[in-house]
Amino acid sequence: MRNVLITGTPRSGTTLICSLLNKLPDTVALHEPMNVWDFAECRDGGAVADLIENFCAETRTSLHEHGFAISKHVRGKIPDNVAADQVNRAGTRLRYTEHGPVSVDKPLSQNFTLVVKHPAAFSALLEVLSQRFECYAIIRNPLATLASWNSLAWFPLKD
């Protein structure tokens, strides 16, 4: 079984990567599905890796037995971008995400590829996680990343 972790700075393209990976056969990519605040209760990085492994195992079971996984989503789909095109009065874009079950209606083998992305949390733990998981960091031009942060209501850099 292949469990892949995606990391990178926020707004670097990790959500787009998940959306694209979900178009591949025998692959499911989840957008920030875990409660990363649970990581703080772990005694060390190895315990966090155990928590992630358990999450992956439970998610695989759920996908095979029930056809769904828990993930952030927009109207039941993992989007390519969580920032809305519309802007608010302040000129910043909003996000419309929910956290809950996402149906996966494609055939999955017993050894399908499961991808989990948590940019900030996995970046902080990359040294430990890369010893147990296949990890990929998404890199985007820093100016484009900062411009994206500046356009969002939930990333108030202007203050």
What are these regions (language model features)?
Residues 23-31:
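Post-Walker A helix-loop "phosphate-sensing" segment adjacent to the P-loop in P-loop NTPases
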Residues 10, 31-33, 139-140:
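Glycine-rich, histidine-containing beta strand-loop boundary motifs that form or position
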Residues 113-159:
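PAPS-dependent sulfotransferase catalytic domain
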Residues 6-21:
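Glycine-rich phosphate-binding P-loop
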Residues 1-4:
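Extreme N-terminal starter segment of soluble prokaryotic enzymes
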Residues 30-115:
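PAPS-dependent sulfation machinery
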Residues 14, 99-104, 121-124:
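A generic local structural motif
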Residues 23, 35, 144:
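Active-site micro-motifs of SAM-dependent methyltransferase domains
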